[in-house]
Amino acid sequence: MEDLQPINPNTDSPTETGATTIEARFSDFCKGRLTMDDNALEEAMKLFNQSKHLFMTNASALGSGTPEEAEHYWFAFILFSMKRLSKKNDGEDAAKSSENSFKLYQILRVAKLNFVDFFKELPQFIVKTGPILSNLYGSDWETRLQAKELQANFVHLSLLSKFYKRAFKTLFKATHENVEGQSAVANSADYISNCHRFGWMLFLALRVHAFSRFKDLVTCTNGLVSILAILIIHIPARFRNFSMSDSSRFVKKDDKVVDLLASLCNMYETSEDELRKTVVRTNIVVEEILKKDPSMASECTNGNLDNIDTDDLTYFQDLLEEQSLSSDLDVLEKDYDDAMLLEGELDERLFINDEESLLGSSSLSGGAINMTGTKRKVDSMTSPTKTITSPLSPYKSPSKMISTPVSTAMTTAKWLRTVVSPLSSFPSVDLTRFLQSCDKDVTSDVIKRARIILEAIFPSSGIPDRTIISNTQTTNLMDNIWAEQRRLEALKLYYRVLHAMCKAESQILHGNNLTSLLTNERFHRCMLACSAELVLATHKTVTMLFPAVLERTGITAFDLSKVIESFIRHEEPLPRELRRHLNSLEERLLESMVWEKGSSMYNSLTIARPNLSNEINRLGLLADPMPSLDAIALQCNMSCGGLPPVPKRDTSPGKSGEIRSPKRVCNEYRSVLVERNSFTSPVKDRLLGINNLKSKILSPALQSAFASPTRPHPTRGETCGETAVNLFFSKIVKLAAVRINGMVERMQLTQQIRERVYCLFQQILGQRTSLFFNRHIDQIILCCFYGVAKISQLSLTFKEIIFNYRKQPHCKPQVFRAVFVDDRSSSRRSKTGQDHVDIIMFYNEVFIPSVKPLLVELAPSNVPKNPNNQVSDSNKKDESGPCPCPGSPKVSSFPSLPDMSPKKVSAVHNVYVSPLRSTKMDALISHGSKSYYACVGESTHAYQSPSKDLTAINNRLNGTRKVRGSLNFDEVDVGLVSDSLVTQSLYLQNGQNGKGPSSSSGQELKTE
């Protein structure tokens, strides 16, 4: 296809020029710029016309809100959807399609958009046009669209390209220092630049021909490291940025020659076995595509191989020679062009070309947009921790100094490889004892179930005909090997955590008979799904993104939410990154997924809240019966040869996208350090006042959590469904409290406003629960803020609330741009006809009519409690003044959320560690004293809790090194801090006069 030029940006407003002009511009975009044929144009125009009314009502919400940019976004969305969903299967139509094909990167180039902004705005288009796309392309349209997979692939390539650039720059010089003359220097620079491009193009060829479906981040990193090995032994030694005699960097074999692959494994945390296998695959790609003759490196006398152990290395005589490098690049370019014709929306060469205008400079993270209000690089945005170092910090090796998403993934994979992989693939002796102690021996049932479920999650390709030698056969074989390895890892992790849970459960129940739990089908599937999700998260696959494990195991988000906390608690050495992943999943489940149609939470809710049954049934929210094991096995067998079809539940109502936000972890009796990004902490759990410490320590047995909702709870005098719903609601309230507090701090509102918003949210959850159905909890929180502001006569507009919400780490635009409303309700029949509206329309038409009586009760004492008093009409400008303080102080209803939540990390000494926010940490801890603190998320060793570093810190404090100033650490036990001191320093009392240690000071601690 010829190079495409941008369209003329001089367009008029869609509301001014009318639909006909918009259609003409869209036709010119398609036919004039993308050279589409008449058939493709007709199909694109059909989708455009059916969605045109949605564009008219939502144009101002797209991008920056300018008419021309909004049109460009909508054109790109329409063409992307049409192309992805209208692919033909028969040969003739496929041939026509290839002749008339256009790629997403070409659409964006014409529209003057970039990938980051495109993926940022795409979710709200999907939510708005979902019913239209379903009618035109079938109910499985979202699965075939693969928008999340494309976004994850883009993020991975961004990370991999930066990893490759950093590694190449570290290993090789930009020019050779000993050359003389300007032309020689230029030629030298061109050669290194071409070598750099050659490495990336060879990596793309490896992805196309060797990695097939499972292009996970760990496998791709192994591929890049294998290419670095090939570059090292083929690029002339004079361009190296290192010396083979550098003993600190390289692993020596027999104290003489360097083991190159082992050295690279040490540098980049790769598996040596996997790297050696990947090097073999890379050599095959070089041999077959570039037609190079391989020879054993041990038989070559090239100077590049000096001081290198040449055993098992392959050398290509003319590879990367200046005379042939240009032609080799042309061959790789042609090979990639051929692959792009068949499949691919993203030209992966863009990452080596540094086309910032097309790639974008904002950040995408983990398949979800990270809305921070500032533009930062992808690698720094997705980096899980901020590394803090100082001259006094404990020693860290150079490879650990910089934490990036790639290095974190490789470290996590190393944990899976070294801790989990050596375990047995069968239940241990102790676990078998629990399985045999049930009313009947369930060992065989557990083994059979695990095999079926894990084969459904990690399916094998069809067995190819051994008489046919083809690239497909090779990739299918590697797919099967990859899937089998992941199945084994998930299986071993499942047995390991299951045994730990059984042991803990037996202590709670004072017996080994766990029949109710170990015969519960739903519990085992949740455990298998959790184990598989951790394996997938470790390898960071593109093709299996959450919630795929839910769909393939037949469970729901509510089911999985019951085991996540227990899973984390009973797998002590779980790396921090995987803890964060599970915590973020739990938060996604709580904030929206559990409220979606088809959630088993509604089945429990009909038992716990019978008055909601009619509304739940009217909206069709109940979950379908869980598919049997036989049905899953049959589906997996029928799908052999490809990924099993993922049945998408009808979740279009209320679908609000994936929100990233602070994470939630543990309970009070866990002896693990809470991460700084947790959305609650052990101390916060206590201060929330939802459950006392005793009820937490004596937590309900897991078998009660997975029992039938109608079954009476053995100890609580209520049904198991009521217990499950109450526990779930308590988690929702905790999450809402932290998010409300974050918004209050950002907007600098008073404690009274915070308490009223929190109380209103609690009352809505308890008394107007149906407002949460098919919605996101942030939508309710935002409406609570505005309603409380109106009733408190506070000058705060919805625009200001949304402006500040967009700065929150968990924000996504579709939360306030697409709120579900029930078109079948009588109050909506004469409205716009949309089932998703903006949050202001939702507030006026749905929220206020339902919540007004609750709001009126929260009005300050000096405000008349008139039911019609200023709680609606959110489109009007707020002109009221600030709310005076109530006449008399009262005990705060809002849970205390101190900035520095102390965690007791020693059973012997009163030693606390506080997870400071980064802003507080930078302000309170000077550069010279950072080594005295264990900062949450920081550690001197891989996948180790930072609390383990306290011993090293105390040893430094108790050492003989003199400290500047007049302090004498030899006369006090600096490792001990009294409980009362911590309590006096850190607890917020929120108006509880005389009831706490801080009351004597008379001064209130200010939150950040």
Swiss-Prot record:
Stretch list, region Pocket: 404-853
Biased composition (Polar residues): 380-392
Keywords: Cell cycle, Nucleus, Repressor, Transcription, Transcription regulation
Highest taxon, organism lineage: Eukaryota
Transport is among the record's keywords: no
Region (Domain B): 723-853
Localisation: Nucleus
One GO location term (cellular component): nucleus
Region (Spacer): 606-722
Major localization listed first in the record, in broad terms: nucleus
GO-annotated biological processes: cell differentiation; negative regulation of G1/S transition of mitotic cell cycle; regulation of transcription by RNA polymerase II
Region (Disordered): 375-394, 865-899, 988-1008
Span list, region Domain A: 404-605
Sample GO molecular function, one term: RNA polymerase II transcription regulatory region sequence-specific DNA binding
Signal peptide span: none
Family: Belongs to the retinoblastoma protein (RB) family.
Reported function: Regulator of biological processes that recruits a histone deacetylase to control gene transcription. May play a role in the entry into mitosis, negatively regulating the cell proliferation. Formation of stable complexes with geminiviridae replication-associated proteins may create a cellular environment which favors viral DNA replication.
Protein name: Retinoblastoma-related protein
